[in-house]
From Swiss-Prot:
Heme 1 (or BL or b562) is low-potential and absorbs at about 562 nm, and heme 2 (or BH or b566) is high-potential and absorbs at about 566 nm. Binds 2 heme b groups non-covalently. One of its GO terms (molecular function) is metal ion binding. This is Cytochrome b. SUPFAM superfamilies: a domain/subunit of cytochrome bc1 complex (Ubiquinol-cytochrome c reductase) (SSF81648), Transmembrane di-heme cytochromes (SSF81342). The gene is MT-CYB. It comes from Talpa altaica (Altai mole).
Length: 379
């Protein structure tokens, strides 16, 4: 008799995705981040659901409702900090996942990659809206500054911003709609992740060598299920250490002050995972130019498959490209640091140089280096 997991309509889908899925035998721990992102998403949906039971999306009570969750709700502090720091872990996994894709040439699976870029935008939008909800000083001013960027769009900018605000400033209408969108977006992200997986399973996974692994496949279960569980344990350990020992390490102290439209904080900055893009935005003196650079800094990922000039897929056997990749990583870390600094000398100059280098590396230096490596191989 055939096993039920191979015949039952629902079990069949699970079986072909997580049990009998043929996987390359040599994929490293860099391939763990997909499953870790799934765990992060589930954690965020669950903790978010419990937070939403106690949160009120009204400007008068939002801040005190978050305080109430932390002080009066059973383990409310734990749920709140798991949610806030879970977002940080989510972005760490996201950046690692994208970095893996860049290094090993996974972006040549075009459909999977483009849905991944769409997912990145969706997660960033969700995180931004979530940061507004506690209605602290940085929530309010972050929302004001970031939504105001849309006013740089010619002709329709001002009307668009007021339409998003639901008035003439960030107020009750803005908070209510941000809460509604923040609640629905994770489910849209989950659906997109399903499509992401669907396209991935059409082609099968890439592997560190970048070569075809059709001749050497192993079943996903038990090999990679066990491997993924190890990754999950490490993730849970790191998140637990963060939540239980220093839950406010990655937050902003200004957000413990209730929102006050009459008092601007000295340094308005987003959460750490947006600082690299914020630094690129600030490095351009022109408002529209800054907004375009900000959008393009993420959208540039969609161009990467077209900028692939190497005869090899992976960077595993390309030492010169590897150097440029790690230079890009260092550049992004520099941008992250600059984004959190005040706008003054020498940070302005460093930010401008790092921003130029970011676009130069991706658009010019990496494709040219790949061509040079091709000629060195006499191809």
């Amino acid at each position: 008799m055939t096993n039920i997991r191979k015949t039952h309509p629902l079990m069949k889908i699970v079986n072909s995705s997580f049990i009998d899925l043929p996987a390359p035998s040599n994929i490293s721990s860099w391939w763990n981040f997909g499953s870790l992102l799934g765990i992060c998403l589930i954690l965020q949906i669950l903790t978010g659901l419990f937070l939403a039971m106690h949160y009120t999306s009204d400007t008068m009570t939002a801040f005190s409702s978050v305080t109430h969750i932390c002080r009066d709700v059973n383990y409310g502090w734990l749920i709140r900090y798991l949610h806030a720091n879970g977002a940080s872990m989510f972005f760490i996994c996201l950046f690692m996942h994208v970095g893996r894709g860049l290094y090993y040439g996974s972006y040549l699976f075009m459909e999977t990659w483009n849905i991944g870029v769409l997912l990145l935008f969706a997660v960033m939008a969700t995180a931004f809206m979530g940061y507004v909800l506690p209605w602290g000083q940085m929530s309010f001013w972050g929302a004001t500054v970031i939504t105001n960027l849309l006013s740089a769009i010619p002709y329709i900018g001002t009307e668009l911003v007021e339409w998003i605000w639901g008035g003439f400033s960030v107020d009750k209408a803005t908070l209510t709609r941000f809460f509604a969108f923040h609640f629905i977006m994770p489910f849209i992200i989950a659906a997109l992740a399903g499509v992401h997986l669907l396209f991935l399973h059409e082609t099968g996974s890439n592997n560190p060598s970048g070569l075809s692994s059709d001749t050497d496949k192993i079943p996903f279960h038990p090999y990679y299920t066990i491997k993924d569980i190890l990754g999950m344990l490490v993730l849970i350990l790191m998140l637990s250490l963060l939540v239980l020992f220093s839950p406010d390490l990655l937050g902003d102290p200004d957000n413990y002050t209730p929102a006050n439209p009459l008092n601007t904080p000295p340094h308005i900055k987003p959460e750490w995972y947006f600082l690299f893009a914020y630094a690129i935005l600030r490095s351009i003196p022109n408002k529209l130019g800054g907004v375009l650079a900000l959008v393009f800094s993420i959208l540039i990922l969609a161009l990467i498959p077209f900028l692939h000039t190497s005869k090899q897929r992976s960077m595993m056997f390309r030492p010169m490209s590897q150097c440029l990749f790690w230079l890009l990583v260092a550049d992004l870390l520099t941008l992250t640091w600059i984004g959190g600094q005040p706008v003054e000398h020498p940070f302005i100059t460093i930010g401008q140089l790092a921003s130029i280098l970011y676009f130069l590396l991706i658009l010019v230096l990496m494709p040219l280096t790949s061509l040079m490596e091709n000629s060195m191989l006499k191809w």
